[in-house]
């Protein structure tokens, strides 16, 4: 597992398990499913026995989400995200959100009572404004996950996470996807690839 994939998988692991308390058979929605954290979340949710709805923005990205383990895919640029999630799940148990923007509220509205929204980033570049009355009326919870803070505040939680993940990769249970590799002199191109959200999976710079 490349060093960059370690970060995405550790983030997704704590979003799903530490905060999300995912259980087998539950419906997990992953926004930005073709991104680094998104792909890791799909892979880990599938490994936990959960059912996955993945949202992405192009046919190529949606197909990649299916290949990793998403049962349902949603093109959230052309479909009504809330309605698509509700139609597939009847109300999701858990949403993993590395994207932010306008899709966050739609996903929150698609949670079942008691569901959980885990915010792990704002890849869209837009921080969403979510009406807090939705949290109260729907009886859902919203959690934020910053891996750096987790390392600082709860170092004990991370002690066994990486060895566990590496063991699952070695055992064939997890399949990290590296989309593109760049050399150090191609770092500008690599940054553009990430900023323009072209990658499907993780981008790696070889030192």
Positions of predicted regions on the chain:
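Glycine-rich phosphate-binding loop and adjacent beta-alpha segment
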Residues: 56, 102-171, 206-207
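Short amphipathic alpha-helix with an adjacent loop that forms part of the alpha/beta core around
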Residues: 80-90
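Local beta-strand N-terminus motif with an aromatic residue
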Residues: 25, 70, 91-93, 174, ...
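C-terminal hydrophobic helical "lid"/dimerization subdomain
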Residues: 156-207
């Amino acid at each position: 597992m490349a060093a960059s994939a370690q970060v995405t998988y550790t983030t997704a692991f704590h979003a799903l398990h530490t905060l999300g308390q995912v259980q087998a058979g539950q419906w997990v929605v992953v926004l930005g499913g073709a991104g680094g954290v998104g792909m890791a979340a799909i892979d880990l949710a599938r490994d936990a026995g959960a059912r996955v709805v993945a949202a992405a923005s192009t046919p190529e990205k949606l197909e990649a989400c299916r290949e990793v383990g998403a049962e349902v895919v949603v093109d959230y640029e052309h479909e009504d995200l809330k309605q698509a999630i509700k139609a597939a799940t009847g109300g999701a148990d858990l949403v993993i959100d590395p994207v932010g923007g306008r899709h966050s509220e739609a996903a929150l509205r698609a949670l079942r009572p008691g569901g959980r929204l885990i915010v792990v980033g704002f890849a869209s570049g837009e921080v969403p404004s979510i009406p807090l009355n939705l949290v109260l009326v729907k009886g859902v919870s919203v959690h934020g996950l910053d891996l750096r803070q987790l390392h600082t505040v709860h170092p004990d939680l991370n002690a066994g996470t990486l060895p566990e993940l590496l063991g699952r990769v070695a055992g064939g249970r997890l399949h990290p996807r590296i989309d593109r590799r760049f050399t150090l002199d191609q770092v500008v191109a690599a940054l553009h690839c990430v900023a323009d959200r072209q990658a499907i999976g993780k981008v790696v710079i070889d030192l």
